């Protein structure tokens, strides 16, 4: 499934047949030797809400929570009749509310745990202002004009900058 440019392999694991999600993610998400995806989403049983989401990055690391992945698993659960149009699921110990609207999914995210003051990062001769935001899943937020004065995304080497900033 695809969510805003991220692609995921989604598996119903309520039977708990998959015991090592990290190992499976490394194999199945490999774009050369596997199916290929940004991550693996396992839909598991929950005693609190409709289901629990376990998210693994393509390298097998535990991702905790991913908004795009959350929207994908919510649509998957609805399409497979695991959950209704409006439902709740668990991820990383938190409860998220999802609403299916035709082909779109609305997802209520957790309020940020912390937001840093503006910090600066030197990359070569460039000094970039950024903020760190922890929404239970860490994010770095940078104003696009730091890279391109007109704020245009065309020509921005996102993969290069993503690797540097990660």
Segments predicted by a language model, with ranges:
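Short, solvent-exposed secondary-structure boundary/capping segments
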Residues: 103-110
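A glycine-rich beta-to-alpha transition motif near the start of alpha/beta enzyme domains, typified by
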Residues: 1-102, 141-166
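Active-site glycine-rich loop that binds ribose-phosphate moieties when present
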Residues: 111-130, 158-160
